[in-house]
Amino acid sequence: MGKIIGIDLGTTNSCVAILDGDHARVIENAEGDRTTPSIIAYADDGEILVGQPAKRQAITNPKNTLFAIKRLIGRRFEDDEVQRDLEIMPYAIAKADNGDAWVEVKGKKMAPPQISAEVLKKMKKTAEDYLGEPVTEAVITVPAYFNDAQRQATKDAGRIAGLDVKRIINEPTAAAFAYGVNKVKGERKVAVYDLGGGTFDISIIEIDEVEGETTFEVLATNGNTHLGGEDFDNRVINYLVEEFKREQGIDLRKDQLALQRLKDAAEKAKIELSSAQQTDVNLPYITADATGPKHMNIKVTRAKLESLVEDMVKDSLEPVRVALKDSGLAVGEIDDVILVGGQTRMPMVQKAVADFFGKEPRKDVNPDEAVAMGAAIQGAVLSGDKTDVLLLDVTPLSLGIETMGSVMTALIEKNTTIPTKKSQVFSTAEDNQSAVTIHVLQGERKRASDNKSLGQFNLEGIRPAPRGLPQIEVTFDIDANGILHVSAKDKETNKEQKITIQASSGLSDDEIERMVREAEANAAEDKKFEELVQTRNQADGLVHSVRKQITEAGEALPADDKTKIEAALSELESAIKGDDKAAIEAKQQALLEASQKLMEIAQQQAQAQGAAGADAGQSSSSAKADDDVVDAEFEEVKDDKK
C-alpha cells in the first residue's frame, strides 16, 4: 500500500506532507519551495500554469489567472460573499446552470473544484517526485467552518485530480495534530486560532496523552469562511487606489493591469510591515493619461495598516468567544494557544490573540506548514502506519430539516462529535398527504430560509390518513469527513428514500467523470510535451556535437561526406523547430548514419592524440627518473627491537 499524503489546500498557498518515520515532513515542490501559491493560469498557447509560474505572469494576464478559488468552492452565485468578490476579482465569476458560482476563462465556464484540482495535481506530482512512486490517496484539509457543500466540492476536486480522498479533516484539528503528536504529555486544552488567506477558524481542542496514546477531542469550533489575508490585502489595495486618486485624479479600479500590480504590491507591503514600521509602495508607470506616464510612490506605515484592518481583527474574536462558550471552558482554562495561517504573522493579530487569552501564543508551530503536517499524520493513522492517535472531531453547524411554518428543526446540533447518526419521527401537515418533501438545512437560524439549503428529496406513497397520523422517520448520518447522508422512511409501509447530500447544486457524478477525463487528457498532453522537449534537447546536443567534430576533422573529412552531413544537419534543424517528435527522431537517426565517416575520423584522431601523449609521457618520465631519486638515511630494525 502506498503512502497517504496530507494536503493543505489553501486559499493563498497550498502545501503537501508525508509521514517520514515518526515525523511529518513537508515536501519541496519543483521550484524548491515548501509552499505553492494556489494560483492557476491559462496561457494563450493552451498551457495550464500552476503555482509560482502562474503568479509570475499574473500582471500581464489578469483575466485568465485564477486565485482565491477556495472562496468560491461549494458556493451559490447569489451568496453575499460571492457578490462581494464579483466587484474585486479581475477574472470573471459566472452563474452555472445549477446556480453555483463558477468562473469563466476564455469563454469557457469552469467549476471551482475543477480549478482546485489543478493545484491538487501539482501537490500529487510533488509527492510522487519525492517518493519515486505513484500516489493515489490523500487526506485533504478544509476550514472547520466549511459547510457540507464546501466539503463535498473539495472531495470532488480531489477526485478530478486523480486522488482517492480518504478523509476530509478540519484545518485547526490538523494543526493540533502537528503540535500534539509525540510532544504533549498528560492533558492539555488548546485553542487553535487559524487565520489563513481566505478563511478563519477557531477550535477548542482537548489533547490527552495516556500511556503513549494521544486522544484529540474537539470540544467546539466556530469561524468565518470569508475572512482572511485576501481581505486584508483588499483593504490595502483600496487605500492605495484612493490615495493615488487623490494625488493624480485617476481611478485605477478601471485598469485591470494596474490592479494586478497593486495586488502584488499590497501583499508585499503587508508582509514587510510585519517586521518593519513603514514601507514604500513604489510602482513606476502604473498608468498614463494625456500628460504622460504616472508613477505611484506611497508610504504605508504599520500604524496605517493596523487602522485599515482593525475591525477585521476585532471581528475574528467574536467566533472565539462563541467557541469558548460552546466548549464550556473559561479563558483561563486554556493551556496553549496555537496560531495557524500566514496572516497570524501580523503583530497586531498576535497581540489581539495574546490579550484575549492572557498568554503568549506558541511559537514552535510553523503557521504555513502545520496543517499539511497534521493531514499527513491523519493519513498515517488511516493507513495503519500510526496507531497511537485517536481523533474525535465535530460537525461545525447544526443540521436539520424544514418543518411546518418554515422553521428549521435541528436533528444534529453543532459541535456534535462525528461520525454520528440521529433519527427523529415527523408527520404530515395535511390530511391525506401522500408525499412529503424533506428539505435538508445547515445553520443556526430558526427561519428555514436563513440557513444553507443542502438539498431536498421526496418520500412518496404515504397511505392516506389524517394529518399527524403517518410516522415518517428521518435519519441523519454524518461520516468522518463531515459529509451528510439522509434517509426518510414511512414506518407503516417501510418505504424508504436515501440520499447523500450533494447540495441543491454541486457537481453530478457525470460532470465529475467528464472533468476527470479532461484532467487525464491534460496529463497525457503534458507528458507528450515533456517528451517532445527532451527529444528536441537531445537533437540539439547532437547538432552541436557534429558541428564541432566537422571543425576538428578539417581536411580529413572527404568533401562528399561533408556535403551529406551538412544536408542531414539542415534537415534535423528544421525538424527541431516543429512539433513532430517522430520526425525529429528520424532525422536524428539519419544524421547519425550520415556522420559515420566523421565518427571514424574523430576516433582515429583521439587514438593518435592518445598515442602521442603516451610517447611524450614515457620520454619525460625516463628523463626525470634520476632527478626523482632522493638519498635517504635509514636504520636497520633488529627483530629484538620490534
From Swiss-Prot:
Disulfide bond among keywords: no
Induction: By stress conditions e.g. heat shock.
GO molecular function, one term: unfolded protein binding
Keyword line: ATP-binding, Chaperone, Nucleotide-binding, Phosphoprotein, Stress response
TM annotation in the entry: none
Skewed-composition ranges (Acidic residues): 628-642
Positions bearing Phosphothreonine: 199
Pfam annotation, one family: HSP70
Keyword ATP-binding: yes
Superkingdom field: Bacteria
InterPro entries linked to this entry: ATPase_NBD, Chaperone_DnaK, Heat_shock_70_CS, HSP70_C_sf, HSP70_peptide-bd_sf, Hsp_70_fam
Region Disordered: start-end pairs: 601-642
PANTHER family linked: HEAT SHOCK PROTEIN 70KDA
Family per similarity comment: Belongs to the heat shock protein 70 family.
Function: Acts as a chaperone.
Name by which UniProt lists this protein: Chaperone protein DnaK
Organism: Aeromonas hydrophila subsp. hydrophila (strain ATCC 7966 / DSM 30187 / BCRC 13018 / CCUG 14551 / JCM 1027 / KCTC 2358 / NCIMB 9240 / NCTC 8049)
